[in-house]
Amino acid sequence: MKKVPTLSLALVVAGAMLVGLGVTTSGTASATEPRSSSPVPPPYQDRYNALRSQLSNFAALPGRTVPHSPTIIASGLEPANGNLMRPGVLNTNLLSTATTLAHRMKTLGETGVTIQVNFPLLLSSFPDSAEYTTFYRDIARVVHQEGLTLAVEQNPLFGNISTLPVASFYAGLTLQSYAAADHQMAQTVIDVMHPTYLSILTEPDTYTAVIHQPDINLNSPTIGAQFVNLVMDGLQKDGTLVGGGTGSWINPSYDQLLLAQTPIDYLDMHVFPIAQSDLSNMTSQVSSAAAAHKTIVVTECWLYKQSSGGTPLDNVQAAPDEQKIETYSFWEPLDQQFLTTMVRYARSKKFAFVSPFSTLNFFAYQTWTSALDAQSSQLVRAAFNQKVQAALSSGGLSAVGKTYQHLAA
């Protein structure tokens, strides 16, 4: 979900591509080192080399191969993302599409599913909440029937993509009123969906930007801990594990405070940039969780390519550019290496759950050309969409998808 515009564009693409399509899988991954079928273009060569070096540093982190690891291998169920909800959703094929994809995820070998059920969709005071509650009840039943472990991210709706009246709902929220409403929704998620994992805070910087109210500054670790405590106070968990955390680009002292001053059951850690500072933060987060006797759940991870500097770029054009370059096939070897290293590391450190973010890349990439690269992000993504649609219809997987299938086996 890092950053706001990045998620926005990713979800628009996911919604456009997945609604109404069946997803099938085939093939297995090679155990050999991944090789690029496309040459790295000169404009990206330096960044590619830097990221490849960072991946080597990631792979060199202490850890050992763990055979028969219990770590849940999952990915996001994009058609069920709350940012795609609309009035009348039960009269569309969105539930059918989400159901089909859940079936295919199990066929791929995955043992878990991540769903974003966004605040305030399930609040009784929010328009059409009964319909959204029914949708999530039904898709949760499908996930449970498939024997998949369900993780829910309770992130706020993104006002820049959702057509729902979320801006007016956010207006005037205070930390206390937001936490009280989030508590109410968390209880509904538990009662209706019965997830194994429920994350109530994952990227405090993104939450702060999305809610955009002067009294809600979750960038402060102290305020973040206060928020988590308010949401969890009196929550009837009924077997659901409730957690929170940050991204690997955020100072690990934030997570240390959450572990020390809140009753979270696990630490949720998002992994995108992997510069040395991010890897250092990540290893500190892992050590802190172990010292607190808490497991780690990774509800989102992917190799960030817009910069190799370790901090996600935060201007208006950065996120569309990231989504644009994600489509190019010369990145496939790095994405394969990232997923392989991420899963190995998660298993070696006994993470409970790991779930990649850019699942459309499991199905297709496209060849870079200078002419394509000169086009807008919207046009590049439109061309990518056609390739994803063809792969979904034919049952194909990209090399990255085959790698993940091999990892999940």
Predicted regions and their residues:
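Secretory targeting and sorting signals
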Residues: 2-31
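Active-site mouth loops of central-metabolism enzymes
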Residues: 77-97, 168-177, 246, 324-334
